[in-house]
């Protein structure tokens, strides 16, 4: 029996990320020089002592499944518990594609039953943050809550993207609305919930039998529990948290990790490590005329050009005379001589010809570059975009 197990929602397509999710799910998108987005939530589980995690996949899961494997990088390759990948399935008693966040959990109730947990932690694999779930669980138990929702204040201009709630001084939630057109609060749900399992199970079964339900926690389960006067509490989070659901927010979050003080978030915190697969490549190399300033350069990369305020993943080569600024360079990219890349995102396995210039204006979201785009836009000898 486990006191609390985690259910990690990782099946999102992430349409707003455009080309970045054309071949794989959003949680598998590279981030921060050596990681994938899902590494942050999985590492939170490891660091919080959550030893059993079910990962619910759906859209284009191949790269994500390969990355997670048996969970060893996160110390989750246990004989009992550990990490389990839970794709949609069909069986003699139903099953289908997940039609919503609540439906994904409903279809995997048998998995949860194996561990007979008292509490279930529902988390998402597409946010960047460092959080101790044990602190949230302690509050949940202390307040005798039926569900605890982790919340954070967001800019008013972005409030309509989230579930918005009101809570009193005791953090009791008395109003909740999913993605309102005219938000009355900027206190947003982070999509992190702790439920009493017996209560959640009851509501999942009831919701599955409602023909007009959207099978969603924010649209259906939480409002139903609130209407039935269950004890809903807010857990206020004051650290760094970023929903990287758009190209702009993805670029901003990567740039944030380069800042000395970005709101209590650091890849160098030895007490809260971010775990991932090690590529076993040699150290990066910066040549005689190469230069890197305020940048992450990952293993296997060879730099002869100038890198500034940028994130460079593994096995990237940058030739002499090239200048890269405020950009994200994914793994296995080759950049020729005398190129300029300013505020762009270069996808994995892209080859950029000599003399190519890409600049994104600050007024628009950063360009995404891959071989397909290059072939359609540039002449063989390179060009200026």
UniProtKB/Swiss-Prot annotation:
EC number, as in UniProt: 2.7.7.27
List residues binding alpha-D-glucose 1-phosphate. Answer: 98, 163, 178-179, 189
Task: Provide the GO biological process annotations.
Answer: glycogen biosynthetic process
Top-level taxon of the source organism: Bacteria
- SUPFAM superfamilies given for it? Nucleotide-diphospho-sugar transferases, Trimeric LpxA-like enzymes
Q: Does the keyword Secreted apply?
A: no
Report the pathway entry. Glycan biosynthesis; glycogen biosynthesis
* Record Gene3D superfamilies: Hexapeptide repeat proteins, Spore Coat Polysaccharide Biosynthesis Protein SpsA, Chain A
Chemical reaction(s) catalysed: alpha-D-glucose 1-phosphate + ATP + H(+) = ADP-alpha-D-glucose + diphosphate
Q: Which keywords appear in this protein's UniProt record, sorted alphabetically?
A: ATP-binding, Carbohydrate metabolism, Glycogen biosynthesis, Glycogen metabolism, Nucleotide-binding, Nucleotidyltransferase, Transferase
- CDD domains in the record: ADP_Glucose_PP, LbH_G1P_AT_C
Chain ranges passing through the membrane: none
The record, for InterPro entries, names:
ADP-Glc_PPase, ADP_Glu_pyroP_CS, GlgC_bac, GlmU/GlgC-like_hexapep, NTP_transferase_dom, Nucleotide-diphossugar_trans, Trimer_LpxA-like_sf
Gene Ontology MF terms in the entry: ATP binding; glucose-1-phosphate adenylyltransferase activity
Q: What does this protein do?
A: Involved in the biosynthesis of ADP-glucose, a building block required for the elongation reactions to produce glycogen. Catalyzes the reaction between ATP and alpha-D-glucose 1-phosphate (G1P) to produce pyrophosphate and ADP-Glc.
Q: How does it assemble?
A: Homotetramer.
Which protein family is it in? Belongs to the bacterial/plant glucose-1-phosphate adenylyltransferase family.
What is the designated name of this protein? Glucose-1-phosphate adenylyltransferase
Protein species of origin: Oceanobacillus iheyensis (strain DSM 14371 / CIP 107618 / JCM 11309 / KCTC 3954 / HTE831)
